[in-house]
């Protein structure tokens, strides 16, 4: 949809731009077509993050006001439910779209872009014309954005995930969200940039070399890009877009090294181990503030050692209390056994005493019975009836008989 709208708007705006001079070579006509395709977005002046800087920039003193690193309508955090802005729009737009024209009285090296009075964004190279010298100067200015696009094509493709194939639409940004602006920007102008880079033999850089140069920092293509490679770094470092992470887990600011920064952040080292689990460090990544990345393990080991010592101490205390309780019970049982033994001894002594008394009575009874057996049986006394009392008359007669018997003898 975005590419169709860009083509329609480019067809409508092609008559407004003046035609190139007849003395220009055929190679200069291709940049103009690419520039007109880049001018398709009418509100591109509102999305610019940097102003154009011509090649003879040299060492320009910094202005009192800083560069507008962000758009006027961009938020630090995107609203809820909307994908975050990609990194493509944060880079200088000279590689993908043309810069708006500046008024005649404005400062040529001004860091702020100024729209034209008629409200239409036009290429600064097309505003000059009339003489051969002006035509040559316009050709140089028209070639400038295209060279910048060839130089920064590798870095933009690396950011947007494109592999120099115009058929693929991989609008995934660095933080994993789907970006529509990156898709429209890369698909709308990558075809013209790829064609110009292949047809132009003076550049000497293809897509792979541009990617290698952009990965190395983009310093090799600094003069061809028309701007120093330093402004790219503050964009990704000064204006971080925080991704929506899980609750309770602090996420690092997203940049080109999002994977290394996220997995290398010491989030697990700062959280104490709840169940004694040691966080596994990522090999090859050293956490900030430590040389070997293992300073958290001794702390966890000390914590586990303290818990182990506390458990041992509590076990010792419980064992000592149980031993004391058992010893007290044993002492009580021993005292009770001694008391019972004493009572048993006393009872046994009393039983023995009663037995001896019983034996004495038994012997006395037997002696008395023996004495009675010596006497003859009496007539009036029956020995069998012990309980029967003898008659007094009979006893008196028996006594008289005994006395008479003794006298006779």
Swiss-Prot record:
Compositional bias (Polar residues): 152-178, 216-228
Coiled-coil parts of chain: none
Basic and acidic residues composition bias: residue spans: 1-16, 133-145, 314-327, 398-409
CDD domains referenced in this protein's UniProt entry, alphabetically: bZIP_plant_GBF1
SUPFAM superfamilies given in the database record: Leucine zipper domain
Matching Gene3D superfamilies: 1.20.5.170
Gene behind this protein: BZIP16
Subcellular location: Nucleus
PANTHER family found in the cross-reference section: BZIP TRANSCRIPTION FACTOR 16, G-BOX-BINDING FACTOR 3-RELATED
Region listing for Disordered, in residue ranges: 1-63, 118-236, 274-327, 362-409
Predominant location: nucleus
Molecular function in Gene Ontology: DNA-binding transcription factor activity; identical protein binding; sequence-specific DNA binding; transcription cis-regulatory region binding
Domain of life: Eukaryota
Region (Leucine-zipper): 333-368
CC per GO annotation: nucleus
Result when mutating residue 358 to L: Slightly enhances DNA binding activity
Protein's GO biological process: positive regulation of DNA-templated transcription
Name of the protein described by the UniProt record: bZIP transcription factor 16
């Amino acid at each position: 949809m975005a590419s169709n709208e860009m083509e329609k708007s480019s067809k409508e705006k092609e008559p407004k731009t003046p035609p190139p001079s007849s003395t220009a070579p055929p190679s200069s006509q291709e940049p103009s077509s690419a520039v007109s395709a880049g001018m398709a977005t009418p509100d591109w002046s509102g999305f610019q993050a940097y102003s154009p800087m011509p090649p003879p920039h040299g060492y320009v003193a910094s202005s009192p006001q800083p560069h507008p690193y962000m758009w006027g309508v961009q938020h630090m955090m995107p609203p809820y439910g909307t994908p975050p802005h990609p990194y493509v729009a944060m880079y200088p737009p000279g590689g993908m779209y043309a810069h708006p024209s500046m008024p005649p009285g404005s400062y040529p090296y001004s860091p702020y872009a100024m729209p034209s009075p008629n409200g239409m964004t036009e290429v600064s190279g097309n505003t000059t014309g009339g003489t051969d010298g002006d035509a040559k100067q316009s050709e140089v200015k028209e070639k400038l954005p295209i060279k910048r696009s060839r130089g920064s094509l590798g870095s933009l493709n690396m950011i947007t995930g494109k592999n120099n194939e115009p058929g693929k639409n991989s609008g995934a940004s660095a933080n994993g969200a789907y970006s529509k602006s990156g898709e429209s920007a890369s698909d709308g102008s990558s075809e013209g940039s790829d064609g110009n880079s292949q047809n132009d033999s003076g550049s000497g850089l293809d897509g792979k070399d541009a990617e290698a140069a952009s990965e190395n920092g983009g310093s090799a293509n600094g003069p061809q890009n028309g701007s120093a490679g330093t402004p790219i770094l503050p964009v990704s470092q000064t204006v971080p877009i925080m991704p929506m992470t899980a609750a309770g887990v602090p996420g690092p600011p997203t940049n080109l090294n999002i994977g290394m920064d996220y997995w290398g952040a010491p989030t697990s080292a700062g959280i104490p181990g709840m169940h004694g689990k040691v966080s596994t460090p990522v090999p090859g990544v050293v956490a900030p503030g430590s040389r070997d990345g293992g300073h958290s393990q001794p702390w966890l080991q000390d914590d586990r050692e303290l818990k182990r010592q506390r458990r041992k101490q509590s076990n010792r205390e419980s064992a000592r209390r149980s031993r004391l309780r058992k010893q007290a019970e044993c002492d009580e049982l021993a005292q009770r056994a001694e008391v019972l033994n004493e009572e048993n001894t006393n009872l046994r002594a009393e039983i023995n005493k009663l037995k001896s008394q019983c034996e004495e009575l038994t012997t006395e009874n037997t002696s008395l019975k023996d004495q009675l057996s010596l006497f003859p049986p009496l007539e009036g006394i029956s020995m069998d009836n012990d309980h029967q009392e003898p008659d007094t008359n009979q006893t008196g007669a028996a006594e008289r008989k005994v006395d008479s018997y003794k006298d006779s003898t």
